[in-house]
Amino acid sequence: MAKIGLFYGTQTGVTQTIAESIQQEFGGESIVDLNDIANADASDLNAYDYLIIGCPTWNVGELQSDWEGIYDDLDSVNFQGKKVAYFGAGDQVGYSDNFQDAMGILEEKISSLGSQTVGYWPIEGYDFNESKAVRNNQFVGLAIDEDNQPDLTKNRIKTWVSQLKSEFGL
């Protein structure tokens, strides 16, 4: 099976925990390389044909600081032919008007650079007003809400990883 590069940013550790769960659901570190974007360069994304990008929405609809720091550097990455999946951590109750915005901001940027987005996720089961991560009535990736729906996280990850295995062609 091809190596998958999972790049995540985290402020409080929630996104890292989700990333580790995704890695384990895929079968461990022999399949998925975990990369904290705080310790990586944008050019590190070039090493993989399959990418998973994880980012919490921070403050009011903003990118997590480490993703914000390399956002412009993403222009130098060759995303042509890469399949990219996204996951986000957010609070649909406290931040209903910008739930998962960071995931949408990153997907919009990276897809504009030639990648193919995979891993779309249904909006059913969530209660929010607005999100930059919704396209055609679906999230652009897996939406996790550990603040309000922690009991759903494990099953959502399991279902999404199964979907990704198929969409990545693995």
UniProtKB/Swiss-Prot annotation:
What is the protein named? Flavodoxin
Required cofactors, per record? Answer: FMN
Read off the NCBIfam families from this record. flav_long, PRK09267.1-2, PRK09267.1-4, PRK09267.1-5
UniProt function note: Low-potential electron donor to a number of redox enzymes.
User: Cross-referenced PROSITE patterns, in alphabetical order?
Assistant: FLAVODOXIN, FLAVODOXIN_LIKE
Q: Which PANTHER family match?
A: FLAVODOXIN 1, FLAVODOXIN 2
Listed Pfam families: Flavodoxin_1
The source organism is Synechococcus elongatus (strain ATCC 33912 / PCC 7942 / FACHB-805)
Gene3D superfamilies reported in the protein's UniProt record: 3.40.50.360
